Amino acid sequence: MGLPRADWAWIGEKTTEAFESPSEVRRITANSEIFKYFYDLVRENRRTGANEFVSGLTARAGSGSGLTDEELVFNFAGILAGGNETTRYTLAALTLELARHPDQWRRIAEGEVDPSVATEEGLRWSVPGMHVMRTATEAVRVGDAEVAPGERVVTWIGSANRDPEVFDAPDVFDVGRTGNRHVSFGAGRHVCLGSRLARLEITAYLRALRGMVTSVELNGPPRYNGSNFTWGLNELPAVLS
Ligand code: HEM
């Protein structure tokens, strides 16, 4: 996003706090600080035009068909949040499962399963974005439920990813699973903007691990965050040999 290097640590920590702080006040404060940061960036960039990413979007905003300042700020915050938490949770969850299932690790290490295939199982299994919500614009039936206009519907992605009608042995972690139709990136109009980048990162991680490491072992209890939205491991004491 072309943000100054000096701001990276601060903005990364603020994003984690905005989603995962146990204190509601700190979550709200962190969100406000992030919005103010991006609002200042948009205004500053109007003057200097120095940030290419912001300039690209503000140019579209100015064309009459694009985004308002408020929408720009929300989108910046969304891209930041989407990119910051999620991918690292899949990497950590994959590492944990590979430590728990040395047989699965060997399948990757010995070349039986390509890292890009194992990436999909890591995504199905880890579910860093736990749910998405939509508001019904018209009456609709979902399964056995009638949904009235204006009612909200939440889909729990972890549940969908273990749907026995879609996945064989859904509770089995199988790095070689094929036809892996998980919905970890959501679906439809708001499907994850960063899914290609995330897949690239996770596959690169597995390739690096395969090249550098013979075994993955835990040496302490995994510790998860307390969020029901962006959920994942905060701590994973492990030995990579
Ligand atoms: C394992 C990694 C990731 C997972 C599991 C994930 C998950 C998701 C999910 C479930 C949604 C849909 C939200 C909805 O339908 O309401 C979404 C949207 C989005 N993601 Fe990701 N994401 C990941 C990585 C990333 C990365 C790396 C970026 C950015 C660099 C990113 C940026 C976004 C953005 C901007 C949206 C909103 C798209 C829209 O509303 O049109 N995500 N993501």
Regions found by a protein language model. Name each.
Residues 1-241:
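Cytochrome P450
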